[in-house]
């Protein structure tokens, strides 16, 4: 017999070497949804402790970007890993469906409401458009491998959800948090509506930067305040600095800080009042060389001193405000109560009325002297001309600065006082309660707590009313004269909510007030406003979590969104839940950063660095996208590029190749009949299983702490170091050459089987498609579940027995020795002394500490070092230099004997058996005899 190929146990599996994910994943998805995988996961988890991750609804408009992919994949990894950790994890995806972006899109398609089509038809067009957008985004989320109740998502435009949003408004009213008032709010001229804090973006804008004189009504009074009677010469004025000249027509006061020192200063040929700390800066800005301090006083002493308006025929007082600082300007602040939050608050204390000069369209009303009918930004130059004309303009230049813009139109916005509905931060101690609740939440990363704490501490009252068509209406009736809410408001809200439940928000617009109010309809009218969309999404703790049966009345464990949501969804949810339930709506809040390219730049078409999620899964597969997400530290900016994705592909191939090796070497293994008990297994195999147990414990802990990059790193260490470059390399000889049903081989296959069962579960939350594929190739079991996703982490792993002399420390030491031997073998290969490692005979000269470890393996040490022969001698007898590993010296020679064509080991006994004259004695025992015996490796 000369052909011994059929006597070898060569690896064999149908599991392909190449993932070909882009092609295979859609078929797997079809199988998942044909067999209702999500419901199978839910059924398998029935009765277990619940973990609820409430999905923050993306906006139902436009195609998905990588930020969406990061968000949904992180959520999916959490839900799948929590299932594996023993939780029941219902996941209900949702969408935010009302609001301005959809209105604008629909306006472009069908025109504005009440122009070409009625408001009712316009709302239906918005509903249809949003539904279409949801379907498109849903298909993409599913393609990413995200499991959830996609057939029954929550939409904020669902009739039932709209009704619950109205009921939440009722609770806000019931608890005394709602009031109507005129306050400055962010106002978009293009939207003709107020904006929420989260709808404001800051972009650079060029604006006029001006210093303006307000002439003293009585110079003598001012001189006296500064103890400077008769000092200096020329006109005397208070100087303010502003970048919004258009707000000067609405000026009603000058604010100073009571605690600051102010000085009367001779600047050239005039006298001006400035904060002492800013005198030098203003002198430099005005480029005036002559300066003399005429007198000093505190802001407190200047209270109610009056100055002429720079171009109107009335005077304005100096008032005191804590918001005045010396960070810039002059230390005297132009105060227009209509156009600034601080201005409004401080003016209210002094009973100063708002001017009300700017209309909804951003133009000055017809009664405004000099500027009637002009747009506010157009009026800037006109105001400058007027200031020059009256001699009030001290200095003009143009500066580029950060300025608030509308998130949708990308155009500058203004602060404008309008009658709106607010949730008061101070009423019923809402701010104090919210700040207290923040402390009860686990924030991941931890800096999120300080961030939202500061935002809540400083935020103004929440303007929840909008002047829009497509939104949940503020279904209230107010008195025609007093603007007071109808006394039966709560009862009426519930009646309207029931109508909306059946017919949607159009039920409100179609409602005749007399139907509900009777005679009161003559003295009460409908509120025409809609709710801020952040009220919609912010109330989903009530409209979704408290209503959906799968959540069973449990409170939410986690909210997970991008870090911009501290001021968005996290904030609105916290405000509403605290206002209605006196508690935060979440126990944990996890935030991730934004996607940037490898140079840290934002994605933009102009830079050509935009990567679309579909581009990735169509080319590389969704598993590569998922692995990239899991591999990053999501707490900061998340870098992505084709190079980074290719790197994720390399990581993927290492994991896939490990899985393929495991499966190929389980060929012919039947766990029911071939499983070897741990105590009978060969030492190295027991150690390999214990390595898997250690890895699993670390992986479970990392999953539990949402440290997915740690999971990937631990997976790679296990696959590349502990398995790939050590264990799996060593066992090839035993796996391929020993008798097929020998203990030596079955012990090895038992280890491989345990490791495979564990590994497939480790990767399932991240590499979901690949895990599903591996699951189908594992050895059959009568009780094997159809899908890996219904399973918990594998509980069949075991550690080394305490009595086992060859413990983990032993094998870790051997791993180091083997790495050093490999280094020396590589040098011998480079020197052309040997080719493969099996052509070598290695003499290991070892110290007294290391030598006993090596000698414990006896003849089996050669299998660990993968050489044909190994001799161990005392280090003192070494005739070669000591190696890099202390206590070792290694000599490499060509192996004795001939190469066995079956096992490729060199042996001196080839030819001693006439019947098998070509192979070594070990192979003869494995082919003809009872099979070689192994104890250690």
UniProtKB/Swiss-Prot annotation:
GO CC aspect terms: cytosol
Names of required cofactors: Zn(2+)
Q: Where is this motif: 'KMSKS' region?
A: 602-606
Q: Where does ATP bind?
A: 605
Enzyme class per UniProt = ligase
Q: Which GO terms describe its biological process?
A: isoleucyl-tRNA aminoacylation
Explain how, and how many, cofactor molecules are bound: Binds 1 zinc ion per subunit.
Q: Name one Pfam family in it.
A: tRNA-synt_1
Q: Which residues make up the binding site for Zn(2+)?
A: 900, 903, 920, 923
What family does the Swiss-Prot or TrEMBL record give for this protein?
Belongs to the class-I aminoacyl-tRNA synthetase family. IleS type 1 subfamily.
**Domains (record comment):** IleRS has two distinct active sites: one for aminoacylation and one for editing. The misactivated valine is translocated from the active site to the editing site, which sterically excludes the correctly activated isoleucine. The single editing site contains two valyl binding pockets, one specific for each substrate (Val-AMP or Val-tRNA(Ile)).
PANTHER family recorded = ISOLEUCINE--TRNA LIGASE, MITOCHONDRIAL (PTHR42765:SF1), SOLEUCYL-TRNA SYNTHETASE (PTHR42765)
Its assembly, as annotated, is: Monomer.
Q: What does this protein do?
A: Catalyzes the attachment of isoleucine to tRNA(Ile). As IleRS can inadvertently accommodate and process structurally similar amino acids such as valine, to avoid such errors it has two additional distinct tRNA(Ile)-dependent editing activities. One activity is designated as 'pretransfer' editing and involves the hydrolysis of activated Val-AMP. The other activity is designated 'posttransfer' editing and involves deacylation of mischarged Val-tRNA(Ile).
Give the protein's recorded name.
Answer: Isoleucine--tRNA ligase
Organism lineage string? Bacteria, Pseudomonadati, Pseudomonadota, Gammaproteobacteria, Pasteurellales
- Gene field: ileS
